[in-house]
Structures are given as C-alpha cells and as structure tokens.
C-alpha cells in the first residue's frame, strides 16, 4: 500500500510539472519540424524500433495553444507562432524539457497502463476547467511490447468518436496568438518498449464524419495509399512514437479538397470490376406488337446485353445489319468454344474493326501479343480492363448474325458448285416448247454418255454472278455441315428432261379422244403418217436414232420406243373402228412421212467418241437433210469416179522419151491432187452411209411392225366403212318400215309392195 501511495504522489507531482511546463512552453517557442508545410504532401516518418505515423499539416480546425498531457506516451508538447529561426530544432534534439513530464524509466508496462488511466481522468478535469473549448483526446494510443500495436480489436477505439469533443470556435484564453494547430511529434516515454501506431481501418469512417463537421473551411484530407502498414486517420490526434533518429521518406498519396477523392481511390478496383457488369444503357425492349418483332432476335440481344464480351456502348440498330459477320466478336459468349476458329486468327485482320473506328486506329491496334490485361479509357470515361487484343470497338460490333471469317471462305468455295447445279437445272436445260420436238439448248439427239458428262461438267463450271453485294440472311445462316452436291449430275439432268416430257404428254389437243389410234389416215396415197406435232412431244427424251458408237446402248431407238410407249398404254394393236371408238367425222388428215421426218432432229454423233465436228459444237440436222446430204455427196462421188474411170481407161503408158515422161509425171500429179481433194468427200459419204445403214438395220423390226400395222389399218378401215354403210341402210329401212334381207333385197317387196314408198 505504501508503495502504491508513493507512486500516486509521484505521478501527481509529475503531472503538475508537466502542466506547468506545458503552459510556459506554449508562450516561449513553437516546435517547427523540418519537412513539408501545409499544402504539400506530408512525408512519412520512419524511425528505428518501429513505425511512426506521418505528421499532417492541415488547415482547418482552430487549434488550442497547448495540449495537456493526456497519456504517458501521448503528446505533451504544444506549438507556438514562430519567434525566431534559432529555436527551430527537431524534437529528438530537445528531449530534456519534454522528458520532465514523463514517468521514470523504471516503470513497467503495467504500471504505465495504470498511470495512463489515472492521467486520463486528470486530463479530462483539467481540460474542462481551463480550456473548455479545446480538444481532449483520451487514450489515443495503445502501448505494445515486442510488436506493433493493432488497435482494430481494441474496444477503446470504438468509443473514440464519442470521446472527441471538437469545437468550431476559437478558445477564449489569452493565447490568441495561435490561430492554427499542428500535430506535433514529441518524444515518447522512456518506458515505452516499442513504437506505437494506430490503424485507422476501423475508425476511418466515423472519424472522417467528425472531421468534416469540425472543419468549416474544408481543409484537405490526406489519403494514404493502400499498403499493409498501419495508417493514421486524418484527425488532429497525432500519434507519438519513440525514435532516436527520425528519417523523412516521402510517401505517394493523393490529396484533395473533398472526401470524394478518398472514395474514388478506395473504389478504383471496384470501378474496374463493376464496369464490366453494370451496363451503360437500358436493356433492349422491342415492340412486341410490331409485325417485324422477332423473338429470337430479342433473345439474342438480351443475351448480348446480359453477358457482353467486353463492356462499352452498344452498336445502333441501323448499323446492325451492315456489319460483317464474325462468330467471335458477335456471339454473346455462351458456348463460345463451339466455333472452329480461334480469336487470334480472326482478329489479325484490321477489316474486323467496326466502321466507327478510323483507319489510323485500326492499323495501330495490337492484334497480336501477350494477353495481359491493360487499362483503356473508354468513351464512358470509366477505366475498363481489356485483354491484350486491344480492340477499342470490341462491343460496337453487331451481335446477331453468325458467321463468319473462315465460314465465308468455305461458302465461296462451294458457291460455284451450288450455282452451277442451278445453272444446269434452270439455264443449261431450258426446254424449247415452241418447237415440234422436245429439245434442249445443249443437246438435240442424245450423244454418248462421255459427251453428256463433259457438257454437264462444262455447264457446272459456268461463271456465276460476280456482283459485289452483301450476302442475304439465308446465305449467311446456311450451315457448313450441308456439303455441296457433286459437279456431275447426269441423272438429275435426264430426270428434268423426262419430267418435262411428261408435262407435255398431258397437254393433248382438245379434238383428240382417249383411245385414239396413234397412226392416223394420211391425205396422200402413201403410207399412213406418224402422229402430229401435238403428240410428237410424247416421245421420251431417250428415244432417238442411235449409231453403233454408243458404248452402253442404253437409249433405245426412236421408232421402237415410240411404238412401245403406246403399246404399254394399252394401244398395242389396231382393232376395229368400233373398238378404237373413232368415228368417221373425227378422222383427221396428217402430214406425210417426209414432212414429219423433215422436222425430226438428227445429229451426227462421232462413232469413236471424239469431239463432234469442228469448233466442238454438235450439229443439228433433220433426218431428211441428212439423207439429202448423203445423196448429194454420193452423186458427186459417183460422177467423180466416172471421170476418173474415163481418165484411167484412156490413159497411155509413158514412153521412153523425155517429153512423154514429163507429161506422164504431170498427169500423175494432177491425178494425185484430185484424189486428195476428193478424199474428204469419200470419207463423208462413207460415214453418213454407215450411219444411215445402221439406223435402217436397227429400225428394221420397227419398220416391219409399222408396215404390218398400216396393212391391217387399211383392212380395218374398209370393214369400218362397210359397217357404217350397213348402219345407214338400216336406218333408212326403219324409216320406211321395211327390213332388209342379207342379200340387200327387201323381204316385204317379195310378198307385197311396200306402201307409201
């Protein structure tokens, strides 16, 4: 007990000495710490043994002339207006007067805490009596032993804002010479084992609010950069630390006149993060009552709005349809790995940049390089993080159409094949329906299969329209999984021709009756002619006169297929006129066979499979013209042969003299030249003769069948005429009331004459 009382008395005496020294020192000199003044960036004071908070010179609160000692390790020095430059010394060098009010060095930390509590009570009383309007800061430090203080968990600091008694009016004491106060670094207690520091993380917000209310002139707040070191809030409470040799080390901080700068500094990373999440515009809201409303388009726009690849302004709707398609830039990010292209290969071309981006900027874009995040200032003035690809207009591209980059190349590769197939179906096989025979532009009579395939492949390679235009939405949306059709479609081309022939088979003349005989009576004395042009279109496309050069022999001959086509329809044989259902009034006259043959197309197919004729075009001739040409050439050849025979018969052998030899040699040269000139004529006659002979041989059964039908038709027509005459006589007998006997004599006339005749 005695020791406790002695300690209390010693503390009281020391407290009075500190108070008296504080009052006296306030009037003598002002402690000026070398360093930055008000308005400069405050440095951070580092000393041996621990970390000391910086001294902030801030304008704002009218400071008291002196501070009463509030803590054993707290500030016990006050400052005065400048008196002389000689008195400006660091606090560390003038430690003798400051240590007069401190407890002895033999005190421990426990005793120091007890003395600190009692000292706090005395400080409250003394400050409330003498300086009612001054700042009292109870227990602002925490003494630690062996490590830095961490006051975040200290419950005493939670009551720090309530313990602060801030006044906005200057004190009424006689110390009017002081208009501002500065937080002063005073030497700490000798018994303090380590430096003291305060972490402002838990009390920063509350102290900041009190500081704003306490500063009517809006002093600048010091903002400490984010680090792992404890920092001191911007309050008039300076923390005192012990350090024999203080060193000033500048600390980069941000200073401003308002508290919003601190919020921006603390929330810079949050701004970078939320800039990618918070959009700058409202979500898409199209008019669902409009006839142009597309739910799929609205869903895609909503996906692009919700999950953007990169933040930024959206592209206007009127530019959406004219932006080149790109699967990487225009997809919403969902299922991005489904594309077969990589972003690196797609973004290496400056053409993928939005039209809003100028060419100079497009050429300067880093399309390749490490994918490190970089900060880029966007039009919204918000720093946003972007990948190393560096497309400034990443989100300004359209987001609806798919497609894209390499897909266009694949489409261009298969486009000629697809359009070539269309040309084969629409252009290469136009049917000339005005002609009497079903024809196509590329073929008359069918040629061997190799030639047909060559012409089909040539039609497939026709140049397509190279007009520069934007692809339609159907072309853009076409899927690459559907491969192009092969170039040679002989089956399809033949099927089109066959379907065209079927369509013409239905369109028969109105005068024709179902079941009419295909062979009708001619108006000439010759044999019956074939059907007219209206029924001639019923011929299958494969029915044609064909030579022996056909390698496969699939196409039947013209006449045979014509007859068999009608045989399959149930009209294989000629019956009676009653069975055919043809009356005498419906019998029509048709052109004769030469006129029909004159309109039949005939080509000169090459027997050996070579290209037909000169120029590669297939000649189109009628059968009659071919026969006429053959006859003319044959007649010419025969005349020439007669002349040659006369020359050879009347020729004489060469004599031994020189003149005879010269004449014989000249005659030989003329004869040889004549033979060479007529060699082509001979070959043509032989070729056409072989073709006609082959046609006759192949059509011999058909001709025999036709001749037999003609013979039967004549007899049937006679029988039909007789039956028609008998029916007429029968009608007359019924009118007269008489019946005719088989020998065409009236039976009633034999018995009694008919009355009324």
Swiss-Prot record:
SUPFAM superfamilies: Spectrin repeat
Coiled coil region boundaries: none
GO CC annotation: cell junction; centriolar satellite; centrosome; ciliary basal body; cytosol; nucleoplasm
Bias kind Polar residues: ranges: 125-144, 339-355, 457-467
Record field: compositional bias (Basic and acidic residues): 1-17, 86-96, 405-432, 439-456
Modified residues annotated as Phosphoserine in this record: 332, 472, 478
PTM field: Phosphorylation by PLK1 is required for binding to BTRC in prometaphase. Phosphorylated directly or indirectly by NEK2. NEK2-mediated phosphorylation promotes CEP68 dissociation from the centrosome and its degradation at the onset of mitosis.
Record has ATP-binding as a keyword: no
Major subcellular site: cytoplasm
Keywords: Cytoplasm, Cytoskeleton, Phosphoprotein, Ubl conjugation
Low complexity compositional bias, start-end: 192-206, 224-240, 524-543
Subcellular location: Cytoplasm, Cytoskeleton, Microtubule organizing center, Centrosome
Keyword Phosphoprotein among UniProt keywords: yes
Gene3D superfamilies, per database record: 1.20.58.60
GO molecular function term, any single one: protein domain specific binding
Signal sequence interval, chain numbering: none
Region annotation (Disordered) ranges: 1-47, 67-158, 192-259, 311-480, 509-551, 597-618
Subunit structure, as described in the record: Interacts with CNTLN; the interaction recruits CEP68 to the centrosome. Interacts with the SCF(FBXW11) complex which contains SKP1, CUL1 and FBXW11; the interaction is probably mediated by FBXW11 and the complex also contains CDK5RAP2 and PCNT. Also interacts with F-box protein BTRC. Interacts with serine/threonine-protein kinase PLK1; the interaction leads to phosphorylation of CEP68 and its subsequent degradation. Interacts with NEK2; the interaction leads to phosphorylation of CEP68.
Cited function: Involved in maintenance of centrosome cohesion, probably as part of a linker structure which prevents centrosome splitting. Required for localization of CDK5RAP2 to the centrosome during interphase. Contributes to CROCC/rootletin filament formation.
Name of the molecule in the record: Centrosomal protein of 68 kDa
Gene from which the chain derives: CEP68
């Amino acid at each position: 007990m005695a020791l406790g009382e002695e300690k209390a008395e010693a503390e009281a005496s020391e407290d009075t000495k500190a108070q008296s020294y504080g009052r006296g020192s306030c009037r003598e000199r002002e402690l000026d710490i070398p360093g930055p003044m008000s308005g400069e960036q405050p440095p951070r004071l580092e000393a041996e043994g621990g970390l000391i908070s910086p001294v902030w010179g801030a304008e704002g609160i009218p400071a008291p002339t002196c501070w009463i000692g509030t803590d054993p390790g707290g500030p016990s020095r006050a400052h005065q207006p400048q008196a002389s430059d000689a008195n400006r010394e660091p606090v560390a060098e003038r430690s003798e007067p400051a240590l007069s009010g401190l407890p002895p060095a033999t005190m421990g930390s426990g005793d120091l805490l007890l003395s600190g509590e009692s000292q706090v009570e005395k400080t409250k009383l003394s400050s409330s009596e003498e300086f009612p309007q001054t700042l009292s800061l109870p227990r602002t430090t925490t003494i630690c032993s062996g490590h830095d203080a961490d006051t975040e968990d200290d419950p005493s600091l939670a009551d720090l804002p309530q313990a602060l008694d801030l006044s906005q009016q200057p004190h009424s004491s006689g110390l009017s010479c002081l208009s501002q106060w500065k937080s002063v670094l005073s030497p700490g207690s000798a018994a303090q084992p380590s430096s003291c520091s305060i972490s402002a993380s838990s009390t920063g917000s509350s102290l900041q609010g009190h500081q704003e209310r306490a500063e009517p002139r809006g002093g600048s707040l010091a903002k400490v950069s984010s680090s792992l070191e404890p920092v001191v809030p911007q309050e008039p409470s300076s923390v005192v630390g012990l350090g024999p040799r203080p060193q000033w080390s500048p600390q980069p901080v941000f200073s401003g006149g308002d508290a919003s700068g601190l919020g921006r500094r603390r929330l810079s990373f949050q701004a970078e993060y939320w800039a990618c999440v918070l959009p700058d515009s409202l979500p898409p809201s199209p008019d669902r009552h409009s006839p142009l409303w597309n739910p799929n388009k609205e869903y895609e726009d909503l996906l692009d709005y919700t999950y953007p690849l990169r933040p930024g302004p959206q592209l206007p709707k009127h530019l959406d349809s004219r932006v080149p398609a790109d699967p990487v830039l225009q997809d919403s990010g969902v299922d991005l790995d489904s594309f077969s292209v990589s972003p690196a290969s797609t973004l290496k071309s400056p053409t993928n940049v939005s039209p809003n981006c100028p060419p100079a900027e497009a050429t300067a874009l880093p399309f390749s390089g490490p994918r490190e995040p970089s900060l880029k200032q966007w039009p919204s003035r918000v720093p946003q993080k972007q990948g190393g690809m560096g497309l400034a207009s990443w989100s300004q591209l359209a987001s609806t159409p798919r497609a894209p980059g390499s897909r266009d190349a694949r489409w261009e590769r298969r486009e000629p094949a697809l359009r070539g197939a269309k040309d084969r179906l629409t252009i290469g096989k136009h049917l000339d329906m005005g002609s009497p025979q079903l024809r196509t532009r590329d073929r008359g009579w069918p040629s061997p299969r190799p030639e047909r395939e060559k012409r089909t492949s040539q039609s497939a390679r026709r140049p397509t329209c190279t007009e520069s235009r934007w692809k339609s939405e159907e072309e853009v949306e076409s899927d690459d999984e559907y491969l192009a059709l092969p170039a040679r479609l002989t089956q399809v081309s033949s099927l089109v021709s066959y379907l065209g022939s079927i369509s013409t088979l239905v369109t028969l003349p109105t005068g024709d009756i179902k079941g009419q005989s295909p062979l009708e009576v001619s108006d000439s004395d010759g044999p019956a002619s074939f059907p007219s042009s209206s029924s001639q279109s019923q011929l299958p496309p494969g029915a044609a006169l064909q030579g022996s050069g056909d390698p496969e022999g699939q196409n039947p001959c013209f006449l045979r297929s014509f007859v068999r086509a009608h045989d399959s329809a149930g009209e294989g044989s000629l019956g009676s006129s009653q069975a055919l259902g043809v009356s005498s009034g419906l019998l029509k006259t048709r052109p004769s066979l030469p006129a029909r043959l004159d309109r039949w197309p005939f080509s000169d197919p090459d027997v050996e499979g070579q290209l037909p004729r000169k120029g590669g075009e297939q000649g189109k001739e009628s059968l009659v013209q071919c026969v006429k040409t053959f006859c003319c050439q044959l007649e010419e050849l025969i005349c020439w042969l007669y002349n040659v025979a006369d020359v050879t018969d009347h020729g004489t052998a060469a004599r031994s003299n020189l003149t005879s030899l010269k004449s014989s040699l000249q005659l030989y040269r003329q004869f040889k030249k004549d033979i060479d000139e007529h060699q082509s004529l001979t070959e043509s006659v032989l070729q056409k003769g072989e073709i006609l002979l082959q046609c006759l041989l192949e059509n011999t059964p058909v001709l025999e069948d036709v001749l037999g039908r003609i013979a039967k038709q004549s007899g049937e027509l006679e029988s039909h005429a007789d039956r028609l005459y008998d029916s007429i006589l029968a009608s007359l007998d019924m009118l007269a009331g008489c019946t005719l006997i088989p020998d065409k004599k009236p039976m009633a006339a034999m018995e009694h004459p008919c009355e009324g005749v």
